[in-house]
Regions:
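N-terminal export and membrane-targeting signals
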Residues: 1-22
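Solvent-exposed, non-transmembrane regions of membrane-associated and secreted proteins
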Residues: 22-151, 157-160, 172-227
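Short, charged beta-turn/beta-strand-edge "cap" motif at the junction between a beta-strand
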Residues: 161-165
Length: 227
């Protein structure tokens, strides 16, 4: 092999090494940028905290309903919830409580649960509660994962059976420890609001899962609208 060939071979190796290093650096920068973009926006407004257990259930949401409450006739139960600004679009089904008093949540992370022993969305008073999983057991994000990106004034449309849709505007979003659950989150009286709840990081397997909740509050665009 001539000196010229050796020099060319050395330059080729150097170029290859430089290209590899550059690729690694760019990859690290790309990952760092992605993680920065994944940081949720700062919370805003004042929202009554509500707790969701590691299984996606609001812990201690309400005592088991009485027979009278369970037999209540619903005028316009919700069927679908949409937040166009963040791409949230979930079917809604009515849910109750477990024997422990925990609110149940549909297993499918694409489906939201409406607490059917509380007010309906569009009711004249009280807090209508919708709950959804943040993700599935396989790590796929649920529809309610989009709540982390809502902004003040984003519209929340709830489509109802046998009635016109009701539209709300987001007024608050808060991340709270899941063991903080004031009764106001599930109140049946007072000004009408829509409360949407999901789990929130951090995820701590040794403590059973997510240790916080994301709670979004939205007020009706027309407070006079009812079912």
């Amino acid at each position: 092999m001539t000196d010229t060939s050796r020099r060319r071979g050395g330059r080729a190796v150097a170029v290859a090494v430089l290209a590899a290093v550059t690729a690694v650096v760019l990859g690290v920068l790309w990952l760092a940028q992605g993680r920065q973009q994944a940081v949720p926006p700062a919370d805003f407004g004042a929202v009554p905290p509500a707790a969701v257990s590691d299984t996606g259930r609001p812990s201690g949401a309400a005592p088991p309903p009485s027979v009278a409450e369970g037999a209540a006739v619903r005028q316009a139960p919700p069927e679908r919830v949409l937040v166009p600004a963040v791409g949230l679009d979930a079917q809604v089904e009515g849910v109750g409580v477990t024997q422990r008093g925990d609110m149940t949540v549909p297993d499918d992370p694409a489906v939201a649960g409406w607490y059917r022993y509380g007010p309906e969305p569009g009711s004249a008073e009280g807090s209508a509660v919708l709950v959804g999983h943040l993700d599935s057991d396989t790590g796929d994000l649920g529809e309610f994962a989009a709540l982390r990106d809502v902004r003040p004034g984003d519209t929340v449309e709830v489509r109802r059976a046998g009635a016109e849709p009701v539209v709300h505007r987001v007024t608050a979003r808060a991340t709270v420890p899941k063991d903080e659950l004031p009764p106001s989150a599930f109140r049946r009286s007072g000004p009408p609001v829509l409360t949407l709840i999901t789990c929130a990081p951090p995820f701590e397997p040794e403590r059973g899962g997510y240790t916080a909740n994301l709670v979004v509050t939205a007020e009706p665009v027309d407070a006079r609208q009812g079912p």
